Amino acid sequence: PTDPEDAALLHFTSGTTGSPKGALHVHGAVGAHHITGKLALDFHPADIFWCTADPGWVTGTSYGIISPLTHGLTMVVDQADYDPARWYSILQDERVTVWYTAPTAIRMLMKAGPELPRGHDLSSLRFVGSVGEPLNPEGVAWGAEVLGLPIHDNWWQTETGGIMIANYAAMDIRPGSMGKPLPGIEAAVVRHEDDAVSVVDPAGEEGGLALRPGWPSMFRGYLGEEGRYRKCFKGGWYLTGDLARVDEDGYFWFVGRADDVIKSAGHLIGPFEVESAIMEHPAVAEVGVIGKPDPVAGEIVKAFVALKPGHEPSEE
């Protein structure tokens, strides 16, 4: 018989340096896939579900295949290239009720304009979720305005194997927030030095996002890299490598990857916060922010901006 700790899945995830890491998951992870589908994506047996992630990625496996199967859902599978008109047609024609996609796809749909969705009947949709990167507040507002539904962002990693923090269906969404930890998940914002880990206090301070180990879908190792795996755990916490803050009401907010933070004139600047501010401009369709080396400040903020149709760049 299969044991819950028997190896089941090997998901590869890119590292900031070196070759991709193979994260090992066990058969017992299916328990987390099942319950998080219910709690974070509001699965019901009669749902028609479409996850736009490719099955070669962890989302496409965990939530494009495994989780919906455990709930007996009808699933939409589409392998064609992205096309906004066809996507809206799929939502309409297949009567999709739960849609799980990525912030990049949402921004591409935003860029395509509001006329396309107005020409389709999207009344079957009752829940829209996003994952893979932070969802800017503008994306949440677009969902409410164009789809008639707010978009529920959530957070997890290849290493966590399943959704850890989410904007549940029944909770008030704070645009830009990844939500709150799921039941049974203990998350905190921490600082660590050597093996000492301390929880950040007060609320609102930035630090490393950490989870207490022990949930069923937690990865059990990196293929052939035991030392690298051990370094992820310190002081009774799994250190995710992401930076975050938590507000006084327990909502978590993504700041950036620890190795992506821009260090400028003694200040730590999260690219996502700058991107969110730029995205507020009505002419902006897409933006990416990096740190550019500077002899005085160490790094300065550099933004790459794509404009919406009908807008031209200028020196201003």
Could you say what each language-model-derived stretch is?
Residues P1-F12, S19, D42-I48, L125:
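Conserved pre-ATP/AMP-binding loop-to-beta segment of ANL
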Residues A8-A32:
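Conserved AMP-binding A3 loop
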Residues G31-C51, P55-V98, K111-A112, L116:
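Conserved AMP-binding/adenylation subdomain of ANL enzymes
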Residues A46, T70, V96-T101, M110-R174, ...:
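Gly/Ser/Thr-rich phosphate-binding loop
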Residues Q92, W99, W215, R220-G221, ...:
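AMP-binding/adenylate-forming catalytic core of the ANL superfamily
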Residues G132, W156, G179, D242, ...:
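Active-site glycine-centered loops adjacent to acidic/histidine catalytic or metal-binding residues
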Residues G148, A196, R212, P216-G241, ...:
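Conserved ANL (AMP-binding/adenylate-forming) active-site segment centered on the GW(Y/F)…HTG consensus within
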Residues A188-R212, E248-D249, E312-E315:
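Conserved beta-loop-beta connector loops within the AMP-binding
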